[in-house]
């Protein structure tokens, strides 16, 4: 039996991947800044900064952190624009350049990298839990705490970005106060000044400073690429002009910078200072070394700090997106909650903590893998389509994003070429790959446009998906006829 227009239009639409309607959005600039502040206080920055002190002095590490985070925010301005305006998640947005089925390749890569981080951060939180129980009772069982902490984060993610937002609003000031106090304890315990610590480190120079910056960009690139899953909840003016939309994008990017950079600098400094003063990059061990001599209760309190920092980061940054990917890609198999559970299990089975000792090398490779993906998505939305999309076609198996049986092989080829080109500049792999993909995608899509149109008359129906006016109506005759003609080409 042939499907009706409304059934066909909704064949890829389900409650988990539908655009977030204007009236349902609850995140403003302040809330987004709080989310990013809490996400930025993550143990991975602690470790990366600590491992970097062999090549750079502490002040240089701080500059690299600030520069890397600023670059990440600049990219966020572009990658999140479509999600803020149209309320779509990353899996749906990837259909525009890569096709309805072709998007499976980049989103699977992105999901696996996010799950790597989920497992890694869960291990760090479990280490803190294990240390707390060891200090209190002498009991230690790291595998048990990995499972328990993973389950806690699964339940947290069930409640979505709204719950995570409120948790981060609470956690942010607590984490800030504890971080500042830990800095004081380290300096006081070592009897050194802030200026003296800033000049420590750098005994074995060799790493280019540009690589240091790219490492901190790499720490955020997985979130930068899939930021849609967070900012699709951001409030916007439905009637804003193109200029008004740009101002909204800038306002949210500014909020992200204010949340990300100060927190990253504080926690990065703690990691770098711990390494030069204690000689330990593992935050759980470093805290016991620094604070344990002062007070066991204080050491426990700061292990709670590590636990809270990880808990406030991991669900939003690393578990939300893979869950959306599963339920958007296989809507008949996974609900959002089952997607969260499966994603968490896969992340833990990857056992990413085995790579803790070479984290900076991994971050650089991560940036190189996702740089071309970010370049293609920015180029496609801003330069190729000029911020025009068809929500109706994003949820159809037979629309303008179908390309060759659902796959845009040209965009995938651009990704492969840009990735290969990035290896020509080992110290700037991320930048080279991003720029190469951004530039190559433009002529590539002009060639694609000779066969498949880039725009659809169904764009006029975008607001039907965003305003509370009831079910989406069938496409009008002209749009349907136009789409059929496109698919026959």
UniProtKB/Swiss-Prot annotation:
Organism this protein belongs to: Microbacterium maritypicum (Microbacterium liquefaciens)
The protein's name in its UniProt record: Hydantoin permease
Compositional bias annotation for Polar residues: 479-489
Region entry Disordered, spans: 468-489
Binding of Na(+), residues: 38, 41, 309, 312-313
UniProt key word rRNA-binding: no
Sequence similarity: Belongs to the purine-cytosine permease (2.A.39) family.
Transmembrane regions listed in the UniProt entry: 30-50, 58-78, 104-124, 144-164, 167-187, 207-227, 258-278, 299-321, 339-359, 362-382, 405-424, 428-445
A GO term for molecular function: nucleobase transmembrane transporter activity
Regulation: Inhibited by dinitrophenol, 5-(2-naphthylmethyl)-D-hydantoin (D-NMH), 5-(2-naphthylmethyl)-L-hydantoin (L-NMH), 5-bromovinylhydantoin (BVH) and 5-indolylmethyl-L-hydantoin (L-IMH). The affinity of benzyl-hydantoin is increased over 10-fold in the presence of 15 mM of sodium.
Membrane disposition: Multi-pass membrane protein
pH dependence as annotated: Optimum pH is 6.6.
Phenotype when changing residue 121 to N: Partial decrease in efficiency of both binding and uptake
Lineage of producing organism: Bacteria, Bacillati, Actinomycetota, Actinomycetes, Micrococcales
Residues that, per the record, bind substrate: 121, 219, 318
InterPro entries per the UniProt record, alphabetical: Pur-cyt_permease, Uracil/uridine/allantoin_perm
Gene: hyuP
Pfam families on file: Transp_cyt_pur
Subcellular location: Membrane
